[in-house]
């Protein structure tokens, strides 16, 4: 068979096998893993297909989704879980009816909600001068997000309002003036001061129209300094308390005792709102475990006291330990209390960082001269009445 005859046969039967078919490739924006409500766009690219006009066929799994589309793209304006699946495409060139190879399958996954998670490194309890980085991550997705950072404060006009399930206002969000809105999900504070004490959270967004994630978890930062402008005074003066007891928290400023408010963040991730206030003193008449958390004083201008960790225990034994850091070289006394009465009828073990430090029959122990190495988590244990929660005991350097 001569070449002319072969070419004639090929023309008659429109054979395309003499040239290699171009390959179709599917791309998905903003990401292969998206969330319900986002706008998703699929695009079919013909590699090596030139700029000639193509018609596109789209397939989901094993059936035809859109048979003949002139445009390369199609979109879900508000994606739902049903749209999850494997997608492929193929092109048909209208000038000569040549088809591309079908693309490799690309899987689109649609999840119910976009959740952000804040973590902190190295620690959330810091000393003035330290540096700390808060990281914001969108669960199961890392592409195309921009992030904004906020502090959580009592709501006032002009702030973003966060409401509960019943429509009640929980708190307000105040955008940080130096909030990073770039693609990086981290927020770094260098040379922190006590005024950085507070509760932080992040939001992420992407796409057009803009899609917002849910608010992140709340992340407290607690910073202690040597000379804060005000002190949080706790009465009774200890960090652990029994349920059903009463407690007062007051802000004591040597120059001005007004203009300060007690703030708090409890362990069930809620801002503390004092229901009984007298001047700068907050009175709690009936403690519950929900009061466990971090507390500090704050002025309208943003000045803060050192934060204090308060633990409310529903057991029978607590540890009486100092509220504020003890000066190095001074003595430290710890007591084991049984429903507000010092245990003295039998042996009590005192622990530091889960190792027995002393065993005492008096219900109290003393370190005559403390140093930085004595810092740690302390608790006490009675053989019959139980053990206390742990409390962090810190020390500060003496300056003459």
Question: What spans do the regions from the language model cover?
Answer:
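Short beta-strand segments within Ig-like beta-sandwich modules, predominantly Fibronectin type-III
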Residues: 63-71, 175-184, 272-279, 354-363
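N-terminal Sec-dependent signal peptide, specifically the hydrophobic helical h-region
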Residues: 1-27, 111-118, 220-235, 245, ...
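Solvent-exposed loop segments of extracellular immunoglobulin-like
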Residues: 46-62, 138-153, 255-264, 338-354
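Solvent-exposed loop/turn motifs of extracellular immunoglobulin-like beta-sandwich domains
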Residues: 2-8, 35-39, 69, 79-90, ...
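Extracellular/luminal immunoglobulin-like beta-sandwich modules
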Residues: 88-112, 199-225, 294-314, 379-399
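A short beta-strand segment in extracellular, disulfide-stabilized domains
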Residues: 33, 38-46, 131-138, 246-252, ...
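Short beta-strand segments of immunoglobulin-like
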Residues: 29-34, 121-126, 236-241, 321-326
């Amino acid at each position: 068979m001569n070449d002319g005859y072969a070419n004639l046969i090929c023309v008659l039967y429109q054979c395309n096998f003499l040239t290699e078919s171009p390959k179709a490739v599917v791309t998905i924006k903003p990401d292969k893993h998206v969330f319900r409500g986002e706008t998703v766009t699929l695009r079919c690219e013909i590699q090596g297909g030139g700029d000639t006009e193509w018609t596109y066929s789209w397939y989901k799994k094993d059936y035809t989704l859109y048979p003949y589309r002139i445009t390369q793209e199609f979109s879900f304006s508000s994606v739902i879980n049903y749209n999850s699946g494997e997608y492929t495409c193929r092109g048909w060139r209208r000038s000569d009816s040549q088809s591309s190879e079908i693309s490799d399958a690309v899987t689109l996954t649609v999840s119910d909600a976009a959740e952000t998670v804040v973590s902190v490194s190295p620690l959330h309890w810091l000393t003035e001068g330290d540096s700390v980085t808060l990281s914001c991550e969108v669960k199961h997705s890392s592409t195309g997000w921009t992030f904004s950072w906020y502090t959580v404060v009592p709501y006032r006009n002009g702030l973003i309002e966060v409401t509960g399930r019943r429509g009640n206002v929980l708190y307000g969000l105040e955008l940080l003036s130096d909030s990073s809105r770039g693609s990086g999900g981290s927020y770094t504070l260098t040379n922190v001061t006590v005024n950085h004490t507070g509760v932080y959270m992040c939001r992420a967004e992407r796409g057009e129209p803009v899609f917002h994630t849910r608010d992140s978890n709340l992340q407290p930062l607690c910073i202690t300094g040597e000379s804060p402008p005000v002190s949080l005074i706790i009465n009774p003066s200890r960090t652990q308390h029994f349920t059903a007891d009463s407690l007062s928290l007051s802000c004591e400023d040597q120059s001005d005792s007004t203009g300060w408010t007690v703030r708090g963040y409890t362990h069930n991730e809620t801002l503390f709102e004092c229901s009984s206030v007298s001047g700068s003193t907050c009175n709690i008449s009936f403690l519950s475990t929900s009061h466990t958390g971090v507390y500090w004083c704050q002025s309208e201008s943003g000045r803060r006291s050192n934060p204090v960790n308060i633990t409310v225990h529903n057991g029978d034994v607590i540890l009486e330990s100092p509220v504020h850091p003890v000066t190095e070289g001074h003595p430290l006394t710890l007591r084991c209390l049984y429903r507000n009465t010092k245990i003295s009828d039998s042996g009590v073990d005192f622990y530091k960082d889960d190792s027995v430090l002393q065993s005492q029959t008096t219900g109290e122990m003393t370190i005559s001269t403390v140093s930085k190495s004595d810092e740690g988590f302390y608790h006490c244990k009675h053989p019959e009445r139980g053990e206390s929660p742990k409390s962090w005991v810190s020390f500060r350097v003496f300056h003459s």
